[in-house]
């Protein structure tokens, strides 16, 4: 059994993560933690997330002394704000823990990225170099050797799973950037109350035009420029990305289907549609990314869907953990 500490368990993704790990046969949850200043400190997780009542009636402990909290811990999951993960991860790593960070604090190796897109100066370039980007279907060999796994963002997961087989297969016309229009549920903004996310205010609205931090994350790991426009939808959870591309001359729908099949035929958490495209309802509450496409001449439209809290966060973190420790990849997820 691996002793596990979850920091940031009070949030939406943190609660989903805790539920997955609670039913994992090789994980022992030794503690749930929140920041010392958190209003949730001292409460039961099931008070904040009633669906866990009678299942996870565990207290949320204030994290005061990292060195003390790390004693006897094998695995740490950080479902915390970017700046918090930036400060905490190196301390847990120094204590010998394997860390899975769900924030953006270690996803991109360029330190300048963080001052531009996250608003803080990165102080740990050594860990930026050592961190492995946890896009599970594509980085499994590196994940197996890593001490720090940076779990990808929700939008980048859907976008890269949809595009990477085609980029790597050199099937796209380089003269035209892929255009990603993605809609996310309000849970992507977290539990903290805000006027813009309140019931009567939330609408279907684009945001972060040309400035969203997930755009350079996608570009850094996909290896090709893209235009990315996120949208906030008036629903609780899930992401649907519609991606338009131009194909190289002579590339057919069968070439696209073959590329996807080759990439994901043995990847159980990516589901490919032979006909039609996925709807959001097929993935909400499940750990899958569903992908479908349509071709007309040299034009390609891809639709990718996922639950932003699961394949876009908690489920992928557990998937990475399973890969890292040699467990079945879908253990506790299916």
UniProtKB/Swiss-Prot annotation:
GO biological process: L-arginine biosynthetic process
Main localization of the protein described in the UniProt heading: cytoplasm
InterPro entries, A to Z: AGPR_AS (IPR023013), AGPR_type-1 (IPR000706), NAD(P)-bd_dom_sf (IPR036291), NAGSA_dehydrogenase (IPR050085), Semialdehyde_DH_NAD-bd (IPR000534)
UniProt KW keywords: Amino-acid biosynthesis, Arginine biosynthesis, Cytoplasm, NADP, Oxidoreductase
Pathway involvement of the protein, from the record: Amino-acid biosynthesis; L-arginine biosynthesis; N(2)-acetyl-L-ornithine from L-glutamate: step 3/4
Enzyme Commission numbers on file: 1.2.1.38
Cellular compartment(s): Cytoplasm
One CC-aspect GO term: cytoplasm
One Pfam family, short name: Semialdhyde_dhC_1
CDD domains recorded: AGPR_1_C, AGPR_1_N
Membrane spanning stretches: none
Catalytic site: 154
GO molecular function: N-acetyl-gamma-glutamyl-phosphate reductase activity; NAD binding; NADP+ binding
Function: Catalyzes the NADPH-dependent reduction of N-acetyl-5-glutamyl phosphate to yield N-acetyl-L-glutamate 5-semialdehyde.
Record's protein name: N-acetyl-gamma-glutamyl-phosphate reductase
